Design a protein with these regions (language model features):
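Structural motif
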Residues: 47, 60, 67-69, 76, ...
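C-terminal structural segments of small proteins and small subunits
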Residues: 98, 108-115
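A short, N-terminal "cap"/entry segment at the start of jelly-roll beta-barrel domains
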Residues: 1-35, 51, 117-151
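A generic "binding-loop/recognition-motif" signal
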Residues: 19, 56-57, 75, 91-92, ...
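Short acidic-glycine-tyrosine-enriched beta hairpin
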Residues: 74-89
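Short, conserved beta-strand element in jelly-roll/cupin
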Residues: 35, 40-45, 54-70, 108-110
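Short beta-strand His + acidic residue motifs that chelate non-heme Fe in jelly-roll/DSBH
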Residues: 50-52, 70-71, 87, 93-100
């Protein structure tokens, strides 16, 4: 039997002001499922973000605490604690914390494995919204964070 304890899983810190703990289905994670991946993310207040990106896997974000702005394709909405959003494969999406408290979120995607946008963000090579072939963000959306802001 494998039991994963979130408190003991290493944190990945990303430039867009968030940290992630993968639990299932990713390289080096305690539960080696292949069919799906799952983990938790905390977005810092006032703009912490999972920046505009797409991926081959279908995915769900479940908001556990806080409130933010979710963009999926050409749509933009507020999302809050207790709500989940489906992210279809290859569709660009972005989640931004618009609140003054941390936003806690669980992600689940299938199949499992690491996704390219993590490495792109860490390497500073994440495609920029609106620069071909990457589509523009929906009108009025929070700007995409492609590097850690200087505060």
């Amino acid at each position: 039997m494998i039991i994963a304890d979130l408190r003991t899983i290493a944190v990945r810190t990303f430039p867009a002001r968030r940290w992630t703990r993968g639990m299932v289905g990713q390289a080096g994670q305690p539960i080696p499922a292949k069919g799906f991946a799952m983990g938790v993310v905390v977005l810092e207040p006032n703009g912490g973000q999972v920046p505009w990106h797409n991926q081959e896997q279908e995915e769900v974000y479940m908001i556990l605490q806080g409130e933010g702005e979710i963009c999926v394709g050409s749509e933009k909405q507020t999302i809050k604690e207790g709500q989940a959003v489906f992210l279809p494969p290859t569709v660009f999406h972005q989640l931004t914390n618009t609140g003054t408290e941390p936003l806690h979120m669980m992600y689940i995607y299938c199949p499992g494995g690491d996704v390219a946008h993590w490495r792109q963000e860490l390497d500073g090579t994440l495609p920029v919204a609106g620069v071909s072939p990457t589509p523009h963000l929906p009108a009025g959306a929070q700007p995409q964070c492609t590097k850690k802001p200087s505060i």
